Design a protein with these regions (language model features):
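Cytosolic catalytic headpiece
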Residues: 2-167
Length: 167
């Protein structure tokens, strides 16, 4: 899907902070994402922009393929990634679940940022559809070719995008 149906240029649509001290946690989120190899990490760093992470000491960082990353900052464990990965660290509140469902309806990829103390932020990332995608898929279907879409996105997000282009 990425780069074929969509433009392959992910951008952060929004960050919903669940903690009143967002100014404290934004530099930590930036520091972790600067060290990530995930393709969406640079979109998050760009969105946060001015969050100064130079003083943040990150230790024990490791990435779990397809799930997210975990690290320690000032003795506290943090995670960024899929909801299933985050829920192993801390429970997901009804408010967070509602945010995840909203993101899926919008066709966004959702990433959660959490500490052992709870979910700190919901990050919604989108990638614009290529203007030619729907027409190209329709043309293939008219030629009798069955079109399927492969994606690492969650089922709800994938369904939204597939419906938008006629798959």
């Amino acid at each position: 899907k990425t780069g074929t149906i969509t433009e392959g240029k992910p951008r952060v649509a929004s960050i919903r902070w669940y903690h009143k001290e967002a100014k404290h946690y934004a530099p930590i989120l930036t520091a972790l994402e600067e060290r990530s190899s995930h393709p969406l990490a640079s979109a998050i760093v760009s969105y946060l922009g001015v969050a100064d992470s130079s003083e943040i000491e990150v230790s024990s960082l490791h990435e779990v393929a397809g799930q997210g990353l975990e690290a320690e900052v000032a003795g506290l464990r943090y995670r960024i990634g899929r909801s299933t990965f985050i829920s192993e660290l801390t429970p997901l509140t009804d408010e967070v679940q509602a945010g995840l469902e909203e993101g899926a309806r919008l066709g966004a990829t959702a990433s959660l940022f959490a500490s052992e103390e709870g979910v700190l932020a919901l990050i919604l990332i989108t990638d614009s559809l290529r203007p030619s995608s729907k027409a190209a898929i329709t043309e293939l279907q008219h030629k009798g070719i069955e079109v399927i879409m492969l994606t690492g996105d969650g089922p709800a997000s994938a369904k939204t995008i597939a419906q938008a282009v006629g798959i």
